[in-house]
Every structure is written in structure tokens, then in C-alpha cells.
């Protein structure tokens, strides 16, 4: 497995925290797990938490809060307007991002929805290194066209390139200088690039995007859900930033852009929460008006005061170098194990998740039969570990009139690690499940969709295995 300066004094990966409270894990039998999946029409999103032993479905809102965050909850001020909790939250986010207007929301997709509503019109084009599923869906709902312009290195899952989350600058400039430039309201950069395998974006790439946006008079925004993980990779892989504090790198990244959306359920160490931050006064006023209509008053945005305080504290903790190094090493360790079993994974390992290349792993299953979903179901059946497909089921275009789906670029399976939740023993257990997956690969079959919604179908689609 390719890694970058992940060495520590000792080989053992230890959690840089100790456990103060515990929750029992459910242990299920293979027979029970098959029954549960059949009941939910073979969609892992339908599984109940008490039916999952290790839950790697997402790192969003599933992490553990620190004792300082729990203490901050007790300081929560639940005043409807102008609470102390809001003031503390505003101070931390303003210092971190440098943006003029800080608008809290209940989670990231609420920020995306507001942004899409106030900035996008029918026929607009939204370029990005890669849009994630909810981001893409919100822009499509606004009748815009999200366009992914991932760099060439990012398209090669095995490339050792250090910044495979970068945007293709030549393609971006071609769009901004071309006939459809007037259809582009802004450029959105996702850090880290979740869809592209949790890969980081370099500061140099962000600077070049800023230069292009300035040249062509376009707003530059960040989807910054994993801003701290991106900054850690920058500190490891970009020479000019190797001696810089993680928080300082983060501040520089934010200050290149004109605003951002953040799901604080990731690098805010929160179980709920988000933010939309902007410099433009007119857009901020429109955002606040919509916020009042849909989320709540601008000083709480659908969140309790205690949540705002917990998030403010989490945003102080997330840039700890020891924590970020432990997290990256844990994912890299799991990737090394998978490779040793002959399971192809995206390399280098991402910051928040391991991504299995299901297309290469199961070449006998075509994209329209969802090889990634087959892998996800098998991992659950083998060991009660829940993961998610990020391939044609999630990102493809559903076929019409009996025609097969238009496939996604890649067929990936994401194993996303909740923050500060599982120990090294849990990762060893997951590795054993992956070993059994490799042993069973020739037995895996494809799936077909029997019912699906028009948008974000992977969340609620009903499927069945092919015979």
C-alpha cells in the first residue's frame, strides 16, 4: 500500500485518546444477516443499527464526541436569537475560515440546498473536481448540470500520485473561456475528494483554481467537509507546507475561496450540524432569508444551542496532528491488508475511508448489475460490517424502457471510518472479513433494481440478487 510519511516511532497504531463510555456491539449470525437483508430488499441503508456489528456506512455524524464536547453541551444556551452558543460558534468558524457571513444549518445538504437555490438557475453548469451525491442532487434539482473535471491521475485508481483529488485545470479553463462560460455561476472544489476515493487536493491546485476564477470573474467555493484531513495530507505531501501547522494550512485554504459549505458531521466532530459561509453580502442576505423560511433563525439554523457549542469545540480539536496521523494510518493499514488478500483498492489510501475497486475485483459482473453493491452485501453477510456502494447504483444514470444503466466512471465500495469510534481490534476484524470476501469472490452474483426513486436512488432502492 502506498503511503506518505506515515511512520511513527512504533509500528503499533494506537488511538490517541482513551475511552470514557462504551456501547455494546450487536453480534449476529449469518442466518440472521441474510434475513435482515432480505427484509430490506437487499439495501444496506435499510438495516437497523442493532443489526450491524461494525458500521462503516459513513463517517458523517457517526463519530464519538470528546469529554470537552460533552462539557460544552452543558454550556448550551437555548435562546431563540443571539444565544451565547451562537456567539462561540461564530467566533470559532470565523477565525477558522475568515469568511464575512457565517450561516449555521442542520447539516451539509441543507447548506447545499440553500446555495443551489440562491445561486443557480436552469441550464447552469457547475464545474468541480468531483461532486458528491447530495451536492450533485441539489444542483440537478435546481435544473443545473454538475460537471466533474477530475485530474487525469485521479481517473487511474492505482496511480501513486499524491493529489489525485485535484481538478483538471486545462479542462476547467476551457470551460471558463468557452462559449458556455456565462452559464457557470461558480466553481466548487470538494476537499477531500470523497467521490474520487477520499483523495486530497493540493494547495497549488486550489491556488490555480483561484487564479482562473479571478481571471474569468467567477466565484470560487469549497465543499469543505473534510478540510482538516485535506490539510494533513498537504502537510505530508506538499513541500512548501511540511513545517506548517495543520490549522494554518486550513486557514490558507479557506481564504483562497469566496465561501464554503461544510457538513460539520465530518471534520466538525459533530453528530449533526453544518454551515454555509460567504463573503458576498447580497448572497448572504438571500441565504439568511431562505434559512429563516426553511431552517430557523440565522443564529441557530435548525440547531440547538448545545449542538453549536459542541461543534465549536469540535472545530478546535479536529486539527490535532496526532489524531489526523492516527486516522490516516488506520485507513492505510486496512488498505495494506486488503491488498495482501488480492482485493484491489484505490491507492494511496484516502483520509476517511478505504475504497475497494469492485470493477476490477468482480470483472464478471457488468456495471448495470452493480458489482459494488454485490461486494457491499457480501461484506455484511460475512461479518455484519456495513459499507456502501459508490458506483453505478449511486452515480450512474438509470436506464429507461428496459435499457441498461449508464455506468458511473468507477465501481467503488467505500469503507468509511467513524471518527474516534472504533479501535485497532475493530480494524483487524474488518480485515478478516475482507479476507473471507476474497475467498468467496467467485460466488458473488449481480443484482437488479426492482423499484427506485428518481433522485439519490441508492438510499431507498429495492433490489434482488440475480440467480
Where are these regions (language model features)?
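A short, surface-exposed helix-loop junction/capping segment
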Residues: 67-75, 358
